[in-house]
Amino acid sequence: MALGWYELKLAKDGQFMFNLKAANSQVILTSELYRSRAAAENGIASVQKNGGDEKNFEFRENKNGEPYFILKAQNHQEIGRSEYYSSKAAAQNGVNSVMNNAATTVIKDITKS
């Protein structure tokens, strides 16, 4: 099975962030903002470590009732979150995709693009 990759990039304010992308290039998890590249790389390592275990995911709903999920580290700190989905089943499929792709070691650094 083809695995996805992490895409490390700069946010507009100069901070770092990353997306986990599935093999079809779809973003399946988005990180928070980090002040340094090293902190963002630590965030990627945390997704690699924690993203394969379903107990680290928490389902939520936005104010419009659209489901999404967050991935938490062992210290219960949020590592990343999903897009909004049309149904809980679709959100569960997103969790499954993160679980299947989290262990990838491919990191595409586009901070210089």
Swiss-Prot record:
Sequence repeats lie at residues 11-59, 62-110. Signal peptide: none annotated. Keywords: Repeat. InterPro entries: DUF1508, UPF0339_domain, YegP-like_sf. The keyword Repeat applies. It comes from the Bacteria. Belongs to the UPF0339 family. Duplicated subfamily. This is UPF0339 protein MS1092.
